[in-house]
Regions:
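N-terminal pre-catalytic segment of deacetylase/amide-hydrolase enzymes
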Residues: 2-132, 139-145, 152, 266, ...
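Active-site beta->alpha N-cap acidic-glycine motif
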Residues: 91-200, 206-215, 220-223
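Active-site-proximal beta-strand/loop segments in catalytic clefts of secreted hydrolases
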Residues: 134-137, 160-164, 187-188, 227-231, ...
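Alpha-helical scaffold elements lining the catalytic groove of polysaccharide deacetylases
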Residues: 142, 191-218, 232-279
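A short acidic, amphipathic alpha-helical/loop segment
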Residues: 145-146, 171-172, 237-240, 295-299
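Residue-level detector of anion-binding/catalytic polar loops
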Residues: 156, 182, 247, 254, ...
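Short low-complexity, flexible loop/linker segments enriched in glycine and/or proline
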Residues: 173-176, 198-201, 264-266, 325-329
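Catalytic grooves of carbohydrate-active enzymes
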Residues: 271, 276-314
Length: 352
């Protein structure tokens, strides 16, 4: 009898324990109290999808030329739709190319001056560093030949086109920009802005109309880079450019490629001889000149052989042209309002 009662009591206790466990594990209150943990976990699982990938690192150098500070590594990103990115530049096909040693970004605030012919303050080039610059283009035959020579050596330059020439040959100037070169301005008509015959207003017109013509030819804003024709710096014009936050370019070394007795060989010796004396510098040439187009391939090879390195100069921002001069250039009728079309796409020979 006692054994039966003990067995019955044990069964009752076991049933009570099982019922208690079931209640606390599966009751509605218990289920609700555990739900927030599940929601938080789901939110945490979504975070990596919006986080930056560890591959998202800066690709441009700082204004001073020093590399940008490394950013802290971000957690790996989850699956996401990639944003559109600019295609990477094509690799250089010439293993012995001169190339570009470094790219510097110029803050043009206040109109800084470059080139020791006129400006001594900003000595940013190291020994054996040179900047290639070309004036007076664009011009058929010569400018494309200059572009090819630069492309063959995978190197870059700064171009200062004349506004009128830009309006005559916008398709060539577009090629300059498309090749990755920097495009500034060299006035509208190559007027001497330091002449006593030119007024301050006329000098302003030359400057602004030149920039507007370059903008209209390119279809985009030019760099706030300017070079005076004949390197004739009128004081009032210098002040005006400073107020417009336009960098003013002189040079360190003139190739004198515009002289009547110039030849490709003479031009090369002038440049290389000047670099031997100076050790570095901003070189002034003209893509308008045939001899420069002919000399450039060998000159670039000589620069490479001599251990010289190319520095590319780019502006921190672009120049906002003035509407009145944009209208003035547009009314001249020389610059196409829409994008330029190749002649072959407009006029074709159908019989001969």
């Amino acid at each position: 009898m006692r054994n039966a009662l003990g067995l019955l009591l044990a069964c009752v206790v076991s049933a009570a324990v099982i019922a208690g466990v079931w209640y606390f594990a599966f009751s509605p209150q218990a289920i609700l109290s555990s739900a927030p943990a599940t929601v938080k976990a789901a939110q945490a699982d979504r975070l990596p999808a919006s986080a930056k990938s560890a591959d998202d690192v800066p690709v441009t150098a700082a204004i001073s030329g020093k590399p940008a500070a490394p950013q802290p590594a971000a957690p790996p990103a989850g699956p996401a739709v990639a944003a559109a990115v600019q295609p990477a530049a094509a690799p250089c096909a010439n293993p012995d190319a001169l190339g570009v040693s470094r790219v510097v970004e110029v803050d043009t605030t206040g109109g800084p001056g470059f080139g020791f012919e006129h400006f001594k303050q900003l000595d940013f080039l190291a020994d054996k560093e040179v900047v290639l610059t070309f004036d007076d283009g664009p011009w058929p035959g010569n400018t494309p030949a200059v572009l090819k020579a630069l492309a063959d050596q995978c190197t870059k330059a700064v171009f200062f086109p004349i506004g009128k020439h830009a309006s005559y040959h916008p398709e060539i100037l577009k090629q300059v920009l498309a090749a990755g070169h920097t495009v500034g301005s060299h006035t509208w008509s190559h007027a001497n802005l330091n002449s006593k015959k030119i007024t301050d207003q006329q000098a302003k017109d030359e400057i602004e109309k030149g920039f507007s013509a370059v903008k209209m030819a390119l279809g985009t804003a030019p760099a706030p880079f300017f070079r005076f024709p004949e390197l004739q710096h009128g004081p009032a014009s210098v002040t005006y450019l400073e107020q417009r936050n336009v960098a003013i370019f002189s040079c360190d070394l003139d190739s004198f490629d515009y002289k009547k007795n110039n030849t490709p060989a003479k031009e090369i010796e002038t440049v290389m001889g000047g670099l031997t004396k100076l050790g570095k510098g901003i070189i002034l040439m003209h893509d308008f000149q045939k001899h420069t187009a002919e000399a450039l391939p060998e000159l670039l090879r000589r620069l490479k052989a001599g251990g010289y390195k190319i520095v590319q100069m780019k502006p921190k921002g672009t120049l906002e042209t003035l509407a009145e001069y944009d209208d003035m250039v547009q009314k001249d009728g020389k610059v196409p309002v829409s994008s330029a079309r190749p002649v072959a796409s407009v006029v074709q020979t159908v019989s001969q």
